[in-house]
Structures are given as C-alpha cells and as structure tokens.
Amino acid sequence: MDKPLALGKIQGNIIGGFNKDYETFLFLNVLDAGKARGYLDEIKNEIATSEEVLAFNRLFKQLRKRHGGELGILKATWTNIAFSAAGLDALKIKDLSKFPKEFTDGMAARKKMIGDLGESDPSNWIGPLGSKQVHAVLIVAADSQSDLYQQVTRYEEALTACGGFSIVFRQEGAVRMDDPGHEHFGFKDGVSQPGIRGVDKPTGEDPDQGNPGQDLLHAGEFVLGYATQTHDEKPGHDGPNPDPGPISENGPAWTENGSYMVFRRLAQDVEGFHNHVKNKAAELGMTPELLGAKLVGRFASGCPLEKMKPESNG
C-alpha cells in the first residue's frame, strides 16, 4: 500500500499541470545569499501546491462541461520555482554531495552523453542557458496575457528591489491560438501523460489503468520520498508491475516531496518534418497521416495508433 501523497507540500505543476495558455520563465542568478533567502521566504506562500492546482483543474473541467465552454468561467495565476545545483550552492545550502551526479554536473557538462554536439553545443545556447549562471527558474502561468503581465511585472520589480537576485534570461510561452490544444507539428497535445496512483482513479474495470490505455504508475517515479515502479514482471499480469518498488531518495532528506525539472529549449523544423513525412510515405506506400502517426505515436487528433484509423485524424 502506497503512503498518501502530501499534495499540500508538493509544488503545483509537478503533480497537476498548470494547463495555462500563457507562461513566463524568469531565469535568476543569486547576487546575495542572505537577501535572496529573505525574498524566497517572503514569496513561499505564493508558490502553488499540487493540492490547489488539482482542485482547480477538477472544478474547471466541471464548470466547462456545465457551461459548454471555458471563456471566463474560472481563472487562476500560478507560480512554481526550481533551483539548479549551482543555485543551491550560491544560496549556501548544505548536503549538495547527496544529490545525484546528473543534477550537480548539469546538462552542459554531460553534452556528449546527451548528444548536444555541433550546432547544439552548450556554447551555442542562447543567453546564459549553457553556463552555471542560471541559479533558479521562476515560472508564472496564467489564463490571459494581461494576468500574466501583471504578475510577472510584480515579480520583476520585487526581484530587483530585494537585491538578492538578478534576472539573466526571460522565456515567454503561449499555446497555439490558430490550433488550440495541438503542438507545432499539428498533433493533439497532453494526451500521453501517465496516470499516478493516489491521484488518478481507474475509469474502467482495470484497477491498474486510469483513462483507457493509461497505465497507473507509482508516485515515486515523479516525486521524491515515495514508492517507485519495480522492474520485475508480475506473473499473470499484463502491464507494469502494480506492486510498489523502492522509495525514491535521490537527494538529501529535505528534498522529500520535491522533484527534478529539466528545461530544454529546442528548435523545431516543422516544415522539414512534414516534407520528410510526405516524401517517405510515398516511398512506403502509405498516407502521410499514417506515417506521421507511426512516428509520433498517435494520430493528429490524438486517436491512439492502435486504432489504425487514419480517418479518425483531424
């Protein structure tokens, strides 16, 4: 039996995605540890919890279904914060040796293993992203551009005034307004998320499945301090072993209920992808829609590949 998730101590967007149309990422450098820690103490209650975000998302879905739309029915602006190993060191945090090497080294130092070579070399990354100067990332997500601007402006002014941080890079994000709910290659987004035991409930007869085709996994795969998956197959069971595995403990004891975030800024060649799919599909004697589904793992509509129904695409 898995222990209950302390959702009030887990940051929102770890369990329970923000699911907002607009986001800003503020990349921070620590100038003064004491002042920086003082400011973090001031805003700690502004950091969203998974408990809050999950409750909001459930209510939002209920109201959208009831009203037949989502315009203006319910709004919230969320904040999340993450720290790099260099940032924790700059904040005078102890026990850094207990973190995994992958975290303390950082992506730039592991470029050969990751494949960040040639044009993708960290020396070519925009701004300070390939250096150790990024100490923290403050993520703000909102339903409207105006709500986002208001909150981000407040943080920018406060960060400057506190004297503990400098803002070294800013990344804006927004959903596609021309094709809502779809990523840039045209495929429905957000449909490949695993289910989490203790959060997502079975919707059918199989107790190990959330939504149809969605395996329920132990929370320790995503959050520190909880049971992980066991890699041994369970005789007579189809799918991931439902029995809990070892507790995830990749860090000091105080990291319980925390997680690891990876920020990757990628260039996507949308035209190149579609041209390749079109040409290769002709060689293979299949439609571009089917080949695209085979490459991505689902049709553009989000229809599972197992259905093998190109006409479901759209």
For each predicted feature, which ranges?
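Long, low-complexity, Ser/Thr/Gly/Pro-rich intrinsically disordered segments that act as flexible linkers
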Residues: 1-314
